[in-house]
Amino acid sequence: MSAISGDWLEALKGEFHQPYYAKLYKTVMTEYQTRKIFPPADDLFNAFHFTPLNEVKVVIMGQDPYHNDGQAHGLCFSVKRGVETPPSLVNIYQELHDDCGCYIPNNGYLEKWAKQGVLLLNTVLTVRAHQANSHRGIGWEQFTDAAIQVLNEQDRPIVFLLWGRPAQMKKSMLNNPKHLILEAPHPSPLSAYRGFFGCKHFSKTNEFLVANGLEPIDWQIENI
């Protein structure tokens, strides 16, 4: 199982000594050894690897990883190159097109966002193959809540995009007046028409970043 490194390791090191994390680690290791688990173990902490704490400008929260073959690689909503773009990400691209004029790309690989400071964080970091939410409640929520608390405490402006009720439940943890919190329904086909479409979160994010002297995000994912 890959390890967190860099400034995230320093920020979260207290968690690794907690009893819940020892239990979580043992559970996850056993699951990887005995079952098919996504994402691959080496991709588990990719959100933290691709977006160091000191570079985070935007946080997008997902729930648990995609659970079908070849999809999940440690960034919420993102899929590996060559994999069909999932429906929620199709809707994200549609809103980006309508909001910012981005063309809709032929892939769902969001590393470009992560490398610009968009933390793509699932609240549960692993899942059994073809069993959605199968690792809910084993301890990941406590760990990712700790990461959210670290982000809230940062003495600089960060945008939090909370899509859907599970993400919005984290709002109570976000009380730093420097941050911008934007809420909308989840981009899933079940809820996107209830207000995700038309939320303009991407342009609002960039307006906030620019107003605070930060580089805006280039949201355009290119064709491959």
Stretches found by the model and what they are:
Residues 2, 14-162, 166-169, 174, ...:
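A polyanion-binding, active-site-adjacent surface
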Residues 196:
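C-terminal substrate-binding/active-site "lid" region of AdoMet-derived donor-dependent transferases
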